[in-house]
From Swiss-Prot:
Pathway: Amino-acid biosynthesis; L-tryptophan biosynthesis; L-tryptophan from chorismate: step 4/5
UniProt xrefs under Gene3D superfamilies: Aldolase class I
EC number per UniProt: 4.1.1.48
Keywords: Amino-acid biosynthesis, Aromatic amino acid biosynthesis, Decarboxylase, Lyase, Tryptophan biosynthesis
Name of the protein this chain belongs to: Indole-3-glycerol phosphate synthase
A GO BP entry: L-tryptophan biosynthetic process
Superkingdom in the source lineage: Bacteria
Higher taxonomy: Bacteria, Pseudomonadati, Pseudomonadota, Betaproteobacteria, Burkholderiales
Keyword set includes Cytoplasm: no
InterPro entries given in the database record: Aldolase_TIM, Indole-3-glycerol_P_synth, Indole-3-glycerol_P_synth_dom, Indole-3-GlycerolPSynthase_CS, RibuloseP-bd_barrel
Organism encoding this protein: Burkholderia lata (strain ATCC 17760 / DSM 23089 / LMG 22485 / NCIMB 9086 / R18194 / 383)
Database matches in SUPFAM superfamilies: Ribulose-phoshate binding barrel
Substrates-to-products reaction catalysed: 1-(2-carboxyphenylamino)-1-deoxy-D-ribulose 5-phosphate + H(+) = (1S,2R)-1-C-(indol-3-yl)glycerol 3-phosphate + CO2 + H2O
A GO molecular-function annotation: phosphoribosylanthranilate isomerase activity
Record carries keyword Ligase: no
Length: 261
């Protein structure tokens, strides 16, 4: 399979250049100043303190590897359902070309509930972080496979200066070493290889020995059943980012409750 991540990153750079021309940074700053912030990390820790799994429930219409996951796709309804059934936070895809996401989906989801929201996209430039703040995101994703360490550190510092939480995502031990240079407590381990889109939940388990106790491990991708959840919780992994399993269910929120609670 061709290197999907490289293709996505090339498109992102083109998108950023176009967006900078159409919406200057100063305009985004004005929009951002009108947005409140919700405590993303705090919401996860509150679930842990209550003895529950903390689930970042994803709103995702499609993916490059699986195609369309959900035909009947109403982000506000999905967000409300997640909130009613125990989600800690939301993750909303805003990438249009590869995941059929939208900024509008994030805005609609956030307006429909009180949960903090992660902008799920491929961040390559500080402009996208101000964009995230302006659209109402409370957290952003930084993907180690797409960024060198100095750039990742700069992007994290900028996000934190705007009050945004940062979830740094890794897939292997080298990327984990890179991620551990950041200040964020949120370490996402993607069980899906973004270069091949192959998935194994063993990826998370194999890296737990590297992680300091003050970090929050978020296992991402490939969590498809209660058995997968139990496997992770037995290894003291209590934070999950789940999309596909919920999106394929008739009632996403009910599937969340069935798998986790």
């Amino acid at each position: 399979m061709s290197d999907i991540l490289d293709r996505i990153i090339a498109v992102k750079r083109e998108e950023v250049a176009a967006a900078m021309r159409s919406a200057p940074l100063e305009a985004l700053k004005l929009e951002a100043s009108a947005r409140d912030l919700r405590d993303f990390v705090g919401a996860l820790r509150a679930k842990h303190a209550a003895g529950h799994a903390a689930v970042i429930s994803e709103i995702k219409k499609a993916s490059p590897s699986k195609g369309v996951l959900r035909e009947h796709f109403v982000p506000a309804d999905i967000a409300r359902s997640y909130a009613e059934h125990g989600a800690a936070c939301l993750s909303v895809l805003t990438d249009e070309q590869f995941f059929q996401g939208s900024v509008r989906y994030l805005e609609e989801a956030r307006a429909a509930c009180t949960l903090p929201v992660l902008r799920k996209d491929f961040i390559v430039d500080a402009y996208q972080i101000m964009e995230a703040r302006a659209m109402g995101a409370d957290a952003i994703l930084l993907i180690a496979a797409a960024l060198d360490t100095p750039l990742m550190q700069d992007l994290e510092a900028y996000a934190h200066s705007l009050g945004l939480a940062v979830l740094v995502e890794v897939h292997d031990r080298n990327e984990m070493e890179q991620a551990l240079t950041l200040k964020t407590p949120l370490l996402g381990i993607n069980n899906r290889n973004l270069r091949t889109f192959e998935t194994s939940i063993q990826t998370t388990l194999d890296m737990l020995d590297m992680i300091p106790s003050d970090r929050i491990v978020v296992t991402e991708s490939g969590i498809l059943s209660r058995t997968d959840v139990d496997t992770m919780r037995a290894a003291n992994v209590n934070t999950f980012l789940v999309g596909e399993a919920f999106m394929r269910a008739d009632q996403p929120g009910e599937e969340l409750a069935r798998m986790f609670f």
